[in-house]
Design a protein with these regions (language model features):
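Polybasic, lysine-rich low-complexity intrinsically disordered segments
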Residues: 8-9
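Active-site recognition of the HExxH zinc-binding catalytic motif
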Residues: 90-102
Length: 152
């Protein structure tokens, strides 16, 4: 499970208990908030991943400022419901990048992003750079969509 967190640049699974495997982590049930006009799923490789907008419970999450989280076991991206547009966009792409890393197997044993801190650093840096590219070059998203629709 990975997410955007701002406590010493570490991910939630590292923050819980260092001696407990992350798949034994306490079940977290944040409150789902209805989000009209926002997507509720995204296709990443072969996976259809659900997107939920949640009211975080920082006490249970044992964090002070986590904007989103990707849980590959539940196949879900959770995004804090009350983020401003820029933070929501950045968090969405950030969590999609975590899912892409998992689908591509880049965080498996002996893979380049095996260590969670490596994955978080790469995902964070690439997300921030690409969000700048999209913001500063608004034509690029439309061009990519148009080019993907062309078959020849």
């Amino acid at each position: 499970i990975f997410g955007i967190c701002f406590i010493k640049n570490i991910t939630p699974d590292i923050m819980i208990r260092k001696n407990k495997p992350k798949h034994f982590k306490k079940k977290i049930n944040p409150i789902v908030v209805e989000a009209k006009g926002l997507p509720d799923n995204v296709r990443i490789g072969y996976k259809d991943v659900k997107i939920k907008y949640v009211r975080p419970d920082y006490k249970k999450w044992e964090m002070t400022d986590c904007f989103g989280e990707y849980d590959y076991r539940q196949n879900i991206i959770q995004i804090q419901h009350d983020l401003c547009g820029q933070e929501r966009a950045n968090t969405t792409i950030h969590e999609i990048m975590h899912a892409a890393v998992q689908v591509a197997g880049l965080n498996q044993e002996k893979a380049p992003l095996e260590k969670p801190e490596f994955e978080e650093a790469v995902v964070n840096q690439l997300t921030n750079v690409m969000m700048g590219v999209f913001r500063d070059n608004p034509w690029i998203v439309d061009m990519l969509k148009n080019q993907l629709d062309e078959s020849e």
